[in-house]
């Protein structure tokens, strides 16, 4: 799926690169990144996903979604970013949720909910 369709309504802005690149997967775990993936750097409670940006690029990520500009600069200053699109997110957690929904064609919209209420 094209990156511009994946980041739709996610609060993201492309800072460097191409919006029309094809993305094969969306990951927030650098161990699961494959060539053609988009990596979302999420700040966690124990670790910061920004610390794994260079690993994701090394594994072939085509897009990096980041929240912290200073952290991005620290990790990519000496790397070759040819073919990598950098995308700034207001909230990487929100961006990840919206990107996953877009990538998988909004599966929650296709669910049928049934509620049964009553007493006893």
List the predicted regions and their residue ranges:
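Walker A (P-loop) phosphate-binding motif
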Residues: 101-120
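N-terminal leader/targeting and accessory segments in enzymes
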Residues: 1-98
């Amino acid at each position: 799926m094209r990156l511009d369709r994946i980041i739709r309504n996610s609060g993201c802005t492309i800072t460097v690169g191409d919006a029309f690149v094809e993305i094969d997967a969306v990951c927030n775990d650098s161990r699961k990144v494959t060539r053609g993936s988009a990596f979302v750097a999420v700040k966690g409670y124990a670790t910061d996903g920004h610390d794994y940006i260079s690993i994701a690029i090394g594994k072939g990520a085509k897009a990096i979604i980041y929240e912290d500009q200073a952290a991005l600069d620290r990790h990519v200053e000496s790397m070759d970013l040819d073919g990598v699109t950098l995308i700034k997110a207001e909230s990487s957690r929100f961006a990840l949720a919206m990107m996953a929904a877009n990538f998988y064609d909004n599966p929650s919209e296709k669910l049928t909910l049934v509620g049964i209420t009553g007493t006893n």
